[in-house]
Amino acid sequence: MTTDFIVENHFENKSPVVREIYDGLIKKVKSFGKFQKEPHKTSIHLLNQTTFAGIATRKDYLLLTIKIDSPIKSSRVTKTEQVSRNRYHILIKLETPKEIDAELLEWLKDAYKLSG
């Protein structure tokens, strides 16, 4: 899909930690297999065959939305939205690269598999 938006624009006027978190996240997601980054006006979507995650940059942090088939019970989840019978959007605020841990990657990998 061709758009007028590029990934780099999402990091203008943002703290360097925002880019560090994004780069760390993308590096880990690459281990799942092939995927595409699709930049939009307000976010960057990560796609396998369909979108499995969305990344919105803020001044000092990232908002990661994971698209999954069941709610996640964790204090890390800031919002859960049921969008259909078996689909949930899970919102997680990431403020440091250290938050990209095994738990988060397990959730992302589940979403990646679901989107394939």
Model region roles, listed by residue range:
Residues 1-116:
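Charge-dense, helix-prone N-terminal extensions
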